[in-house]
């Protein structure tokens, strides 16, 4: 070791080494420098920007002329590269470089660009790259910000762009566009000087291209005097120029169809028209009569964008002209007939334009109102085309919002159809249906839209709610939904509102649905600042007060649906109850009841009969629940045989849930959350009866599920009215096709036997069935044929009616089933509230089996509709997440402990009898939940007792036995475990029992004998593997170890070792996949047992396992070599040697390594690894590597000579080492180890020859060469690869570490070597193979 450490000091660097180090540093910088240009051309924008920043930073920190010249040359070359996507990247990098280094002359750069990509000397192949290189070069000069300051470079650039504009096939209008961008930033004096050179005085040339027109407009804007002196007085909007302007705008629209933006030339023309007071002429002649005469979608969208962009520029009169012209009608028609994908593109753009306009005139409410009214009045046969929910309303100030609501209200009351910008589509015009053009239909469509727009103003999330506006809308909706005016009175402003068209039932029905939508908005959207007005009362309470006031003014107002005396008494009683609840408003329960009472009270105007009964029941329940002594009231209810108030309330909530109202659903959840602490078993049974699959399938429910058919028919009629009439023909065709298909399906069905019999009888009665012998009979007469036809017609008519009745019955049943499933999903809300808010309620335990029945039935159901899936998912989520995994659970289970144990047994048995393992998992988890309930109460008492009295473990176990019957539970789970380990197909799984064992180690302790019995018993291999797996997972658990005393634990480990040893007798004889899995499992179990023995230092006799394993070594080795079960044989072999290592037997080296290190007499000199690559010819083999009869001493001496010779440059083929691969030979040929360090072979210090043991294997020349090179690179003397056995492993690991640690520059040693290699060999592919050389260097660092 001393001899190895002595050469670690590096020798003084020679002058040649110092020069090479400098060149190495320069080369490293060059690599980093050159990598920037590769990253600049990458498609990722962040990578490009990062590379450009690093390049600029590199050039700033290293001001080197050669690198700056190379950078400019490389960037200029990149302007015309073949990859078109990379050209803008190089242009941007060049612009930033010129911006950072202002001392670089722009004219020189421009000259270099024109020299590199000469337009005069370019051939056909280089034409396109050269043109783009010059264009991007000029753009780079302009983007640097220095071009407008350098007059000479500017003139050259303008001239170059003018030349490039002569190649429109490649560059299109990009040169003129670049020229316009440049001239828009130059000073006015320079613009006047450049203008004559770029703009000719011919208007035909200007009106030929949008870019030239844009240049003309720019000149007219900046230097109008110079332009007039150059071209004279020009009227751009003359009659002669109108067609040219239209064509130019069409070309401009097509040029930006992919960018989806407004062309600049269109907006410039608009500004010029406004400046010259020619806006009306431009709008009508150019846009409406020109572009929209035969519009394409590009021209139409350009006009729409121009409309939006012009809004902030127009006056009040001009806005009226624009918003009531042909263009706005074309916009509305496009909104109606466009496909959804196109509609979704234009609506956000128009919304952005309108939002910008409204935001810009916040201080002008009149202008905001004009814009909102203008877009509202764009109608298609009375229906506005804009959506009712429009986000731009958030920009309205309070005054404009108030005025807009007033305008909507007035338009609803007295629709002014003449003020609308109405239109009809082409299909609507062709239909010529008189019923579609009547004013009543247009009024209905307009009023329906206005109602939803009013509600959306309140519903909008981003709108700052003004209480006056909210109250105005709410009062308007409530009054006209449920009341009518008899006589106007100043006390009720709504009575002064008169209708020019009577309010029909359809509009009133829309009003009713919109009113309850408004209630939901006021209840949900304002929850952050609860739905309270300034006086602290909810909006629903204020609306109820308003309704009560209207009912009291029966001389002036009457309700649409007249209330009977009983219904009016129910209303008055509700108002008195509300006052009582208001006095107790501090209680959350009172608030919930108040909310329910208000909502049901408002429903009395919609359905008086039903709401009246519900109101009475609710008030009775509220009064009973608010009594001071609820126990006394319950006993009084029992004595009088009346239902408990909470039961009545649950029935009411279930009936309210049957209504398809989300608002009612939320209110029911809220109210039930307050009454669930008072639930009785009868209440729970009412809810579970709704969920029971058997009850729902076999019996009619007590709760009638309503679907509000009238409302749905109304909504359906509204949808039909809102749809486009041009789709009616296609819909009728589809209906006829569907009818034909259904008739064909009916005919294809199996014929009813009864109908077949009737048909045969009719035919026999008419003598239409002739036998074989009746061929000569005469044909039927006309009267007989007519009678037969009538009989057949009546028979088929009856059959058709029967089929139709069956179909109607089937549809009815499907509809009822759908309503029932929807009702069950809603009823699950109550279960979810109960489980989440009252997890410790004793009634929770009664939910397990009903929920399991729902899950089981839903998973077995064949018709897996969406509702079935929703019901299953919601039930499973409540069961698993809210029930089984709840942190809190019931603690009062003492009286029902016996029933709970029976339920555990029943659940486990049901889990084992399921056909689906996924269903069995739910049953098994339910049993685990019950175990936790039983065990949790025990633990709680045990902890209290432990704290107070310091009871020992045995006493606590006795106490546990009194509460949790461990023997009973053990028998139950033992039977299920036996079922798992004996049945061929069992629904139980291993993870189920692993979960049981991890949660309840005491039960696991009792079940261990069952597992041990099946490890070595006459079980199936798969069952033995399962038993081994469960044992392996559980024995390593710390919780299980605590349950055992030390002698008991040692006895268990000894017993399991004996079982495992007995099973090991069959190791290596696997013939099937199950047997092979058993072998893996038993070895994993054995490793776990041995690890436990070693870790806890148990006194266990390991002789038997060792003997069995040693006897199986040869068989396993043969199995591995033969490749039997190749997917797991290596794993099996590794597990085997892990066990042997824990038994004290080290794993020998593999035969592959031995054959490589110690070649036998019969083996080829080439290693097994190199044999796979091919054999060497005899002439290439190294002589005397190992001859026959060679002694170990001679072999070692010959290899020592080989080490010495390896330090000298190889000259002849006979001295070459054996083949080590193509790449290795190339590296050796390029540079020998002695040349790497800059010294000759004579200067290389001779290695020492330590004493060699005869039994020491010699290293192969490949390993020797790796060792030698690594040591020479670091300046150390190469160590002989022949070492004693005791030092070999330590030497291999230590050689690299010590040399690198003692080297003066440990991290730079290998890069220096790589650089010196490159400098010596002068490889031209240095930069391209950087990654390859880094990989080679990393391999050289590794220890051989």
Swiss-Prot record:
The modification Citrulline is found at residue 1322. It holds the Pfam family DNA_pol_phi. GO terms for cellular component: B-WICH complex; cytoplasm; NLS-dependent protein nuclear import complex; nucleolus; nucleus. Residues 1-24, 710-751, 1146-1344 are annotated as: Disordered. Residues 732-747 have a biased composition (Acidic residues). Ubiquitously expressed. SUPFAM superfamilies: ARM repeat (SSF48371). A motif (Nuclear export signal 2) lies at residues 261-279. Residues 1148-1159 have a biased composition (Basic and acidic residues). Residues 1152-1344 are annotated as: Required for nuclear and nucleolar localization. It comes from the Eukaryota. It is found in: Nucleus; Nucleus, Nucleolus; Cytoplasm. Component of the B-WICH complex, at least composed of SMARCA5/SNF2H, BAZ1B/WSTF, SF3B1, DEK, MYO1C, ERCC6, MYBBP1A and DDX21. Binds to and represses JUN and MYB via the leucine zipper regions present in these proteins. Also binds to and represses PPARGC1A: this interaction is abrogated when PPARGC1A is phosphorylated by MAPK1/ERK. Binds to and stimulates transcription by AHR. Binds to KPNA2. Interacts with CLOCK and CRY1. This is Myb-binding protein 1A. It comes from Mus musculus. The gene is Mybbp1a.
């Amino acid at each position: 070791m001393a001899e190895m450490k002595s050469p670690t000091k590096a020798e003084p660097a020679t002058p040649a080494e110092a020069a090479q180090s400098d060149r190495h540093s320069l080369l490293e910088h060059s690599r980093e420098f050159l990598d920037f240009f590769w990253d600049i051309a990458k498609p990722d924008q962040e990578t490009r920007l990062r590379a450009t920043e690093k390049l600029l930073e590199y050039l700033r920190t290293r001001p080197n002329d050669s690198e700056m010249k190379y950078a400019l040359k490389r960037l200029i070359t990149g302007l015309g590269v073949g990859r078109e996507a990379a050209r803008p990247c190089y242009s941007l990098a060049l612009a930033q470089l010129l911006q950072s280094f202002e001392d670089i002359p722009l004219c020189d750069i421009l000259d270099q660009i024109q020299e590199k990509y000469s337009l005069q000397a370019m051939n056909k192949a280089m034409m396109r790259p050269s043109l783009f290189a010059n264009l991007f070069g000029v753009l780079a000069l302009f983007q640097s910000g220095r071009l407008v300051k350098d007059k000479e470079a500017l003139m050259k650039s303008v001239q170059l762009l003018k030349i490039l504009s002569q190649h429109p096939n490649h560059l299109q209008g990009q040169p003129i566009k670049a020229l316009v961008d440049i001239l828009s930033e130059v000073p006015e004096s320079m613009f006047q000087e450049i203008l004559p050179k770029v703009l000719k005085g011919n208007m035909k040339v200007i009106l030929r291209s949008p870019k030239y027109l844009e240049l003309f407009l720019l000149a007219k804007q900046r230097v109008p005097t110079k332009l007039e002196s150059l071209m004279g007085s020009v009227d751009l909007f003359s009659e002669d120029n109108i067609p040219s302007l239209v064509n130019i705008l069409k070309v401009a629209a097509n040029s930006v169809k992919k960018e989806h933006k407004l062309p600049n030339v269109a907006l410039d023309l608009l500004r010029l028209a406004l400046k010259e007071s020619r806006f009306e002429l431009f709008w009508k002649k150019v846009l409406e009569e020109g572009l929209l005469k035969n519009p394409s979608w590009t021209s139409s969208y350009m006009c729409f964008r121009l409309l939006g962009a012009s809004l902030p520029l127009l006056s009040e009169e001009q806005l009226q002209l624009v918003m009531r012209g042909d263009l706005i009608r074309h916009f509305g028609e496009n909104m109606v007939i466009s496909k959804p994908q196109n509609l979704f593109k234009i609506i956000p753009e128009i919304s952005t334009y309108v939002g910008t306009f409204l935001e810009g005139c916040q201080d002008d409410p009149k202008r905001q109102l004009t814009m909102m009214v203008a877009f509202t009045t764009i109608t298609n046969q009375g229906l506005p085309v804009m959506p009712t929910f429009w986000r731009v309303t958030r920009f309205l100030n309070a005054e404009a919002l108030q005025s807009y609501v007033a305008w909507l209200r007035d338009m609803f009351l007295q629709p002014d159809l003449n003020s609308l910008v109405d239109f009809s589509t082409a299909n609507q015009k062709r239909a010529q249906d008189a019923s579609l053009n009547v004013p009543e239909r247009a009024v209905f469509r307009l009023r329906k839209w206005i109602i939803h727009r009013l509600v959306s103003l309140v519903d909008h999330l981003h709108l700052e709610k003004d209480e006056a506006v909210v109250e105005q809308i709410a009062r308007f909706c409530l009054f006209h939904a449920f009341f009518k005016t008899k006589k106007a009175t100043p006390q009720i402003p709504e009575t002064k509102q008169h209708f020019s068209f009577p309010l029909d039932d359809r509009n009133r029905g829309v009003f009713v649905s919109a009113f309850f939508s408004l209630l939901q908005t006021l209840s949900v959207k304002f929850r952050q600042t609860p739905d309270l007005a300034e006086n602290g009362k909810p909006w629903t309470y204020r609306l109820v007060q308003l309704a009560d006031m209207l009912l009291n003014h029966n001389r002036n107002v009457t309700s649409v649906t007249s209330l009977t005396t009983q219904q009016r008494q129910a209303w008055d009683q509700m108002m008195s109850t509300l006052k009582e609840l208001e006095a107790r408003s501090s209680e959350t329960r009172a608030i919930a009841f108040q909310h329910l009472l208000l909502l049901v009270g408002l429903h009395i105007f919609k359905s008086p009969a039903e709401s009246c009964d519900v109101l009475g029941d609710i008030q009775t329940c509220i009064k009973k629940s608010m009594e001071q002594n609820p126990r006394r009231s319950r006993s009084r209810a029992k004595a009088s045989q009346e239902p408990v108030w909470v039961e009545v309330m649950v029935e009411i909530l279930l009936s309210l849930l049957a209504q398809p109202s989300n608002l009612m659903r939320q209110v029911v959840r809220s109210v039930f959350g307050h009454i669930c602490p008072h639930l009785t078993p009868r209440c729970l049974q009412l809810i579970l009866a709704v969920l029971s699959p058997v009850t729902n399938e076999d019996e009619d429910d007590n709760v009638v599920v309503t679907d509000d058919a009238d409302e749905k028919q109304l909504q359906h009629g509204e949808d039909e009215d809102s749809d486009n009439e041009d789709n009616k023909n296609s819909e009728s065709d589809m209906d006829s096709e569907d009818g034909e298909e259904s008739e064909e399906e009916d005919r294809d069905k199996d014929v009813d036997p009864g109908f077949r019999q009737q048909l045969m009888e009719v035919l026999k009665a008419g003598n239409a069935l002739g036998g074989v012998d009746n061929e000569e009979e005469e044909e039927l007469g006309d009267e007989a044929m007519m009678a037969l036809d009538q009989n057949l017609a009546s028979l088929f008519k009856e059959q058709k009616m029967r089929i139709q009745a069956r179909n109607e019955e089937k549809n009815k049943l499907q509809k009822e089933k759908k309503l029932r499933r929807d009702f069950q999903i809603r009823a699950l809300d109550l279960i979810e509230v109960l489980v989440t808010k009252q997890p410790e309620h004793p009634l929770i335990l009664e939910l397990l089996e009903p929920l399991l029945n729902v899950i089981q039935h839903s998973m077995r159901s064949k018709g897996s509709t969406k509702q079935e899936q929703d019901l299953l998912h919601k039930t499973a989520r409540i069961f698993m997440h809210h029930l089984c995994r709840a942190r809190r659970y019931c603690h009062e289970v003492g009286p029902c402990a016996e029933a709970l144990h029976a339920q555990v047994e029943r659940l486990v048995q049901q889990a084992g009898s399921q056909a689906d393992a996924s269903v069995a998992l739910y049953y098994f988890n339910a049993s685990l939940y019950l175990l936790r309930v039983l065990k949790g109460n025990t633990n709680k008492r045990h902890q209290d007792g432990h704290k107070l009295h310091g009871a020992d473990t045995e006493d606590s176990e006795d106490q546990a036995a009194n509460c949790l019957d461990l023997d009973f539970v053990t028998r139950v789970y033992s039977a299920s475990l036996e079922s798992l380990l004996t049945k061929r197909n069992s629904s139980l799984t291993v993870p189920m029992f692993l979960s049981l064992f991890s949660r309840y180690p005491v039960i696991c302790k009792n079940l261990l004998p069952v597992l041990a019995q099946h490890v070595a018993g006459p079980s199936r291999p798969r069952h033995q593997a399962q038993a081994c797996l469960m044992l392996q997972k559980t024995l390593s658990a710390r919780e299980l170890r605590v349950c055992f005393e030390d002698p008991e634990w040692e006895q268990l480990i000894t017993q399991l070792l004996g079982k495992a040893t007995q099973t090991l007798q069959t190791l290596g004889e696997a013939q099937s996949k199950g047997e092979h899995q058993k072998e893996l499992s038993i070895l994993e179990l054995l490793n776990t047992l041995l690890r436990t023995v070693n870790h806890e230092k148990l006194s266990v006799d390991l002789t038997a396992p060792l003997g069995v394993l040693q006897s199986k070594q040869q068989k396993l080795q043969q199995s591995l070599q033969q490749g039997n079960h190749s997917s797991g044989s290596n794993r099996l072999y590794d597990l085997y040697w892990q066990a042997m290592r824990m038994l004290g037997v080290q794993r020998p080296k593999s035969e592959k390594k031995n054959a490589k290190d110690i070649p036998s007499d019969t083996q080829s000199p080439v290693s097994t690894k190199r044999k796979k690559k091919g054999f060497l010819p005899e002439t290439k083999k190294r002589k005397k590597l190992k001859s026959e009869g060679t002694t170990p001493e001679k072999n070692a001496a010959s290899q020592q000579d080989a080490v010495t010779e390896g330090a000298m440059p190889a000259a002849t083929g006979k001295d070459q080492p054996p083949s080590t691969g193509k790449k290795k030979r190339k590296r050796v040929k390029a540079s020998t180890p002695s040349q790497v360090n800059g010294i000759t072979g004579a200067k290389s210090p001779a290695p020492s020859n330590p004493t060699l043991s005869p039994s020491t294997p010699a290293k192969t020349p490949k390993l020797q060469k790796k060792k030698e090179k690594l040591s020479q690179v670091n300046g150390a003397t190469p160590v002989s690869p022949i070492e004693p056995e005791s030092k070999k492993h330590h030497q291999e690991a230590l050689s690299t570490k010590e040399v690198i640690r003692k080297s003066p520059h440990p991290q730079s040693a290998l890069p220096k070597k790589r650089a010196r290699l490159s400098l010596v060999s002068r490889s031209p592919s240095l930069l391209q193979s950087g990654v390859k050389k880094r990989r080679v260097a990393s391999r050289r660092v590794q220890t051989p």
